[in-house]
């Protein structure tokens, strides 16, 4: 499957997903076009607020559903509680596939970008220290 086919399949599979799904992004090597036959398919999902256990149950459910439908390993990540650096990579390199609530998606993206840029000076200092140790 090429990227376009994967995008279409993921979009179709998530079209009937749980009502709590707000948005979904394809990210990682498939979205960048650098995947190989061994690469998994990374899908980030933004969900309406729900208890943590319910979110994980839904993640496992969607992960299994996508793996069966695509015939390839998938990794579904709940974006609601993902770290800022991962959210930055999803928004920078990812492709929005599903959007059920535009306003909620935009609020999420603005918040995620603000958190990342607030954290960026700390990340840069940390990376410089790690590079100096190597």
Task: Say what each PLM segment does.
Residues 1-23, 31-37, 48-134:
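Catalytic core of pol beta-like nucleotidyltransferases
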Residues 42-45:
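Short, aliphatic-rich beta-strand segments
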């Amino acid at each position: 499957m090429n990227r376009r086919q994967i995008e279409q399949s993921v979009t179709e599979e998530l079209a009937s997903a749980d009502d709590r799904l707000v948005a979904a992004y394809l990210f990682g090597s498939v979205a960048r076009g650098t995947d190989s036959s061994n690469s998994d398919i990374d899908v980030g999902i933004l969900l309406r607020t729900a208890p943590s256990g319910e979110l994980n149950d839904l993640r496992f459910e969607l992960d299994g559903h996508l793996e069966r439908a695509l015939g390839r390993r998938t990794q579904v990540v709940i974006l609601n509680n993902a770290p800022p650096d991962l959210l930055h990579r999803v928004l920078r390199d990812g492709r929005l596939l599903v959007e059920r609530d535009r306003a909620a998606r935009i609020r999420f993206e603005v918040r995620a970008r603000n958190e990342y840029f607030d954290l960026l000076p700390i990340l840069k200092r940390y990376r410089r220290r790690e590079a100096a140790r190597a």
